[in-house]
């Protein structure tokens, strides 16, 4: 039986674990063939669930995609390299056909601050803002996101396609982000790129939206984080990656065809 994304191919970045993996699997459930990217960034000397997940390759995700009868490839790439987006699209097109769905989930997260001595709401400290923290964050979140979208639309037009979906992920709404200032700046830039894409690609049949998940349990949640969420009126609960993936799957389906140019906050 045809499903909403039957015959379409998707590219999901940062998909060896967590939200990215859940999104890739959800798109496969909806019928898409899926390419996933990953970069093993965990500390191999640590055995906690979060580091184990961050140290994984993409084989677990591709196996889950294939269990739904869909084709899958996993590509280990460092998105801080500006040559990677074009190469990714070449590889995905060769293996799965033109990319109709782009989900940019990868992040170059580093915790930096102008007041690094002050612990944040859950007791974590930061490093001082420097060129390394700025480059790590902006190169992966903002620049890679912008180049992936540019590659997407250039190929979309060359194939004379009339249907496309772009979803990027943020943490915040483009305002201040104390304690993680370069993270906030990278996500603010990504929001701007995505909303501009929504305006400029609408006539090509492409929707573009930003999803702002709640605190999500991708393996990093501690008792301190749970206590913070429970006592904060701005947060309703700690989400599972699959809950976020359901929303992104809906945006990527035909049901999301008139939803574009939004920052969609989930709680």
Predicted regions and their residues:
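Conserved glycine-rich cofactor-binding loop
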Residues: 16-17
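Short, small/polar-rich loop/turn modules that mediate ligand/substrate recognition or access, typified
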Residues: 202, 207, 259-261
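Catalytic loop of short-chain dehydrogenase/reductase
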Residues: 108-112, 118-133, 137, 157-189, ...
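Conserved glycine-rich Rossmann-like NAD(P)H-binding loop of the short-chain dehydrogenase/reductase
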Residues: 32-60
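C-terminal substrate-recognition "lid" of short-chain dehydrogenase/reductases
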Residues: 4, 96-97, 240-267
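The beta1-alpha1 cofactor-binding region of Rossmann-like NAD(H)/NADP(H)-dependent oxidoreductases
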Residues: 55-56, 76-89
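A glycine/serine/threonine-rich, flexible loop-to-helix segment
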Residues: 45-50, 116-119, 182, 199, ...
